[in-house]
């Protein structure tokens, strides 16, 4: 009987040590956001609402980074559609996304830590934040879901 209990205790300790290591790795808030950033849909701010919505549907995404001359000028999300577009009599072919985007959004650098992204999201009420290089060229985006998944 003692051997059985010793074996069980040993197995429990091994499982606990594995779980602790997994949790420590999963909640490394100091990790750079480039470790969980994914690519982004980057479009000209002159793109029609129809094209943006079609791309959202086709690519199963809900966020576009908008540019002017290759530099970030805004962000447009599903939430912008709900709050600013739906219910208005608009010609989606003629309307430009720049009239409905969030101008000059908060941005992050790929080397910024996950904790910094989380702080910006909570303080600003953002669900998505563009990631740019040092010259404000979009290189990705991070969502609150990315952060939550990273935390475990």
Predicted regions, residues:
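Tandem CBS (Cystathionine beta-synthase) repeat/Bateman regulatory domains
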Residues: 1-152
